[in-house]
A protein has these predicted regions:
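Alpha-helical adaptor scaffolds
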Residues: 77-119
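Structural register within alpha-helical repeat arrays
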Residues: 26, 60, 94, 129, ...
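Terminal, low-structured helical/coil segments at or just beyond the last alpha-helical repeat
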Residues: 174-215
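A conserved position within tetratricopeptide repeats
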Residues: 8, 12, 47, 74, ...
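Inward-facing hydrophobic residues that define packing positions of alpha-helical scaffold repeats
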Residues: 43, 77-78, 112-113, 145-146, ...
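Long, contiguous interaction/recruitment modules in multidomain scaffold/adaptor proteins
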Residues: 1-25, 32-33, 38-51, 55-56, ...
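Short coil turns that delineate tetratricopeptide repeat
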Residues: 51, 84-85, 119-121, 137, ...
Length: 215
């Protein structure tokens, strides 16, 4: 009997988990309908009901960052901050949060561009410029600067340029469809992470660019 209870606990969603999932799915529909404010409220509720729903938390933090609500995003991200080594999407959020923190103190883009023009190996300036782009959601512009670093010095700053580039790809990727509330938890996922749907030509182009720079 104890084994049955353990199995059910692991594979059958609780009422709270089902309610949180329903809130998260409603949020997705609201985003598609162009109502991010209502979606934020739904996602906040989903995370409050089921703090362990990392998918809902990811969507919540991502939407906060898209709207520039850094302090709220940091607070919502804190409970999963130690999971970044295990989840590529959460790691991507950590990089985005770092970019928004740094962007607030970044030098003027024109100053950075001048520094880069004077010295194409001024990686500090390039990375700083990439962070301002990343923070503002200008993802391809950010990756263009990061790629220039990777092409010249793959290991610069403990591989920071490549790691940030990969994080941006993860932020841009559309996740695979979520499990319905009645489906078993623990369904197959790629290396324990939510699989991403690859159907975006821009994403594919920038993945190829990184691969060519690395190999």
């Amino acid at each position: 009997e104890s084994q049955i209870r353990a199995f059910l606990h692991k594979h059958v969603p609780t009422a709270d988990e089902q309610e949180a999932q329903a809130e998260a799915e409603e949020a997705e529909a609201l985003i598609a309908d162009g109502d991010p404010e209502a979606a934020l409220a739904k996602l906040q509720q989903a995370v409050a009901i089921d703090p362990g729903n990392d998918d809902a938390r990811y969507d919540y933090v991502k939407l906060l960052l898209e709207r520039g609500a850094l302090a709220q995003a940091e607070a919502a991200f804190e409970p999963v901050a130690k999971k970044t080594a295990l989840d590529a999407r959460l790691d991507a959020l950590a990089h985005w949060i770092a970019a928004q923190r740094k962007a607030g103190a970044a030098r003027n883009p024109d100053v950075l561009a001048s520094a880069i023009a004077a010295n194409k190996r001024d990686f500090e300036a390039r990375f700083e410029l990439s962070q301002t782009h990343f923070a503002a959601g200008r993802f391809t512009a950010a990756m263009d600067e990061l790629l220039e670093i990777v092409m010249r010095d793959k290991a610069w700053s403990s591989d920071l340029a490549r790691k940030t580039y990969v994080a941006i790809l993860a932020v841009m990727a559309k996740p695979a469809p979520k499990l319905a509330a009645g489906e078993a938890k623990g369904a197959l996922e790629l290396t324990g992470k939510a699989a991403a749907v690859s159907a975006d030509p821009v994403l594919d182009q920038y993945r190829r660019k990184l691969s060519m720079a690395l190999f």
